[in-house]
A protein has these predicted regions:
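Post-HEXXH active-site segment of zinc metalloproteases
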Residues: 90-121
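Short, flexible/disordered intra-domain loops and linkers
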Residues: 3-4, 62-70, 103-106
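Long, well-structured alpha-helical subdomains associated
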Residues: 1-6, 43, 72-74, 107-113, ...
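Basic, amphipathic N-terminal segments that precede the first structured/catalytic domain
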Residues: 1-45, 49
Length: 155
């Protein structure tokens, strides 16, 4: 078994445990990169109730935020916890519908922030205490992209 196979196996074991702890029945896919080149580490697909983790994209995010891949597995755990947060969000269908129906950019931005904040709130309950500082940094970095337009639109 090579290093890549061990890494995938580690991720699958971590994911199985995290999904079980969350009571989440979503299916898991593991791929290398998010299509189109954007730095998306994970994606929840509500129509198929599937979470996809993008390992090389997560690795790149980890390098950009922390300067190395030292925190890769904890980072992947946090990304998965966030995606589980989307999967477990009972308000996601209504929020997504409101997002799609809205023609106003400020409203869309506020809805996107709510969707992301809900997922992070749920994820925070899944992440072990020893990963809290790392979780906080990743969450803050992720949410800043959603908060900035909302704050700018409020002024």
């Amino acid at each position: 078994m090579d290093k890549g196979d061990r890494g995938i196996l580690q991720i699958r074991e971590m994911a199985t445990e995290l999904l079980k702890n969350a009571g989440c029945t979503a299916h898991l896919k593991i791929k290398k990169q998010f299509p189109g080149g954007r730095l998306v580490g994970g994606k929840y697909h509500p129509h198929t109730h599937t979470i996809t983790l993008y390992t090389e994209t997560i690795r790149r995010q980890c390098e950009l935020l922390f300067g190395s891949c030292k925190w890769f597995m904890p980072y992947a755990t946090i990304v998965l916890a966030h995606e589980i947060g989307h999967a477990m969000d009972e308000n996601l269908p209504a929020l997504s519908a409101a997002f799609e129906e809205s023609g106003r950019l400020p409203e869309k931005q506020a809805l996107a922030l709510t969707i992301e904040q809900n997922a992070w709130d749920f994820a925070g309950r899944l992440v072990p205490a020893h990963l809290r500082p790392l979780f906080q940094k990743i969450m803050d970095e992720s949410l800043s992209a959603y908060r900035q337009p909302v704050i700018a639109g409020a002024h």
